[in-house]
A protein has these predicted regions:
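Short hydrophobic beta-strand element within catalytic cores of glycosyltransferases
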Residues: 37-38, 270, 274-277
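Nucleotide-activated donor-binding/catalytic signature segment of Leloir-type glycosyltransferases, i.e.
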Residues: 53-57, 217-236
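Acidic donor-binding loop of glycosyltransferase active sites
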Residues: 74-76, 244-260, 273
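A short, active-site helix/loop in glycosyltransferases that binds the activated sugar's phosphate group
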Residues: 111-116, 121-150, 160-161
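Nucleotide-sugar-dependent
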Residues: 252-266, 278-285
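Conserved acidic donor-binding segment of nucleotide-sugar-dependent glycosyltransferases
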Residues: 289-290, 294-300, 308-313
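C-terminal amphipathic helix plus adjacent low-complexity
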Residues: 329, 334, 338-430
Length: 430
């Protein structure tokens, strides 16, 4: 029986759903012993509690020396990576330790947080969660080829319901979205897309997710006269109940978003919903246009898709049936577990080596810079904040400048950049 130690920053959002479903599936299989170590106390305990119910050992540990001891005891160590500054701090503090290291990247690495090619060589096995990562626009041909030959790809799939899809009757035509409401993930022109179809009879837009960006979305929607057609559910634990009350699932993401497997999109497809997503990034590797959903490129194409689906409920039903069958056949926690077991089998054939993360950067601000895509990194080269920054770097979380500065308060460079951003935004900069 192999001892496999998973190290994650937290159990929030999509990662929490994936890890709880995956580790519960491993526990049900028997065989290997999996243990989960968190670097932060869970803010929401729903996924954490699911692990306890499944008999999976999970606890919080922040002492790097104690974690190193656990790593040395394990046969395999799997890092759950999305460039969270708490994980960065742990790796910078980690003493030398021998391990068979697997790094499972829960971000595409195509934009920010970027994946430097050299970082892929640190673990014995680097594992992507989307085929889109192989097409990183800031790698050259040789780097893409190396990734294709040496990095694995395992979709980070959570546990989807096996129940037959149910649709609850409701008034109007419900166009739904579930996920992060920050414009770092949601398309910055989301309300502009919605405005194209606001005259559809009874249409309303149901947004499910933490309400931290609700005021801004409402403000952006006001000029389009959309205020009465926006409905915010806030964070919910029963996503399935929300999906049952939707007619179409509209997944309009920032063209430079960081996502990969997009479990909530797959969950909507599993629920038998007709999905409309942008023809970009990871989404185009998950939705088959015209078969399991619709892919659009512009607000005009989105309008055409929504009007078509409104006018033809039988088309919504066809796409939903196909989507459900596609998820059943191609995306399951069992398949994810099997693919990861194959990775573990390969890694076990190798000897433990000393974990060395010094190549990430010698200082926290250097690590931050090294995981920016090259054009953004060049903008910081003069020591000040570039005038134009993507939304993800301006926020409070999601590995933003201020997020890094909070975790590394002694790093004067990071703190200076954070102060500059706060001053700009206080003066009306966005």
């Amino acid at each position: 029986m192999r001892e496999i130690l998973h190290i994650t920053t937290h159990m929030g959002g999509g990662v929490g759903k994936v890890l709880s479903g995956l580790l519960a599936a491993f526990a049900a299989e028997g065989g290997d012993h999996h243990e989960l170590l968190l670097l932060e106390e869970p803010e929401k305990r729903n996924f954490f509690d699911l692990l306890a119910e499944a008999g999976v050992a999970a606890h919080v540990e922040q002492d790097a020396a104690k974690i190193a001891e656990a790593m040395a005891r394990a046969d395999i160590v799997q890092l759950e990576w999305w460039h969270h500054p708490r994980m960065v701090r742990f790796l910078l503090e980690l003493p030398p330790v021998p391990a068979r290291l697997v790094l499972w990247a829960h971000v595409s690495g195509a934009f920010y947080p970027w994946l430097p090619p050299a970082f892929l060589r640190v673990p014995q096995r680097f594992v992507f969660t989307s085929a889109y990562s192989y097409k990183n626009p800031f790698w050259d041909a040789a780097q893409r080829t190396w990734a294709k030959e040496h990095a694995a790809m395992v979709n980070s799939v959570g546990d989807f319901s096996a129940e037959e899809p149910r649709h609850e009757a409701h008034a109007g035509f419900s166009v739904g979205y579930v996920g992060t409401l920050s414009y770092a993930k949601l398309h910055p022109d989301f309300v502009r897309f919605c405005a194209r179809v606001k005259d559809i009879c009874g249409v309303f837009f149901r947004l499910v997710g933490d309400a931290q960006n609700e005021a801004r979305i409402r403000r952006d929607a006001a000029p389009f006269g959309l205020a009465e057609q926006l409905s915010f559910a806030g964070y919910v634990t029963d996503v399935a109940a929300e999906l049952r009350r939707m007619d179409v699932f509209a997944y309009l993401l920032n063209p430079q978003h960081f996502g990969t497997t997009e479990n909530v999109l797959l969950e909507a497809m599993n629920a038998g919903l007709a999905v409309v997503a942008l023809d970009q990034c990871a989404e185009k590797h998950l939705v088959r246009h015209g078969e399991t959903g619709l892919l659009v490129r512009t607000p005009e194409e989105f309008e055409q898709a929504l009007r078509r689906l409104y006018a033809h409920p039988e088309e919504r039903a066809r796409l939903g049936r196909n989507a459900r069958r596609y998820i059943e056949e191609n995306f399951s926690v069992g398949r994810t577990a099997a693919h990861l077991n194959a990775v573990y089998d390969a890694v076990m054939k190798r000897e433990k080596t000393m974990c060395d993360f010094t190549g990430m950067g010698k200082d926290p601000h250097e690590v931050f810079l090294n995981f920016l895509p090259p054009p953004l990194r060049e903008g910081f080269a003069q020591g000040s904040v570039p005038k134009e920054l993507p939304e993800i770097l301006l926020g409070e979380s999601k590995s933003s400048v201020r997020h890094f500065a909070r975790l590394f308060p002694a790093d004067e460079m990071l703190c200076g950049w954070a102060r500059e951003i706060v001053q700009r935004r206080g003066g009306g900069a966005r």
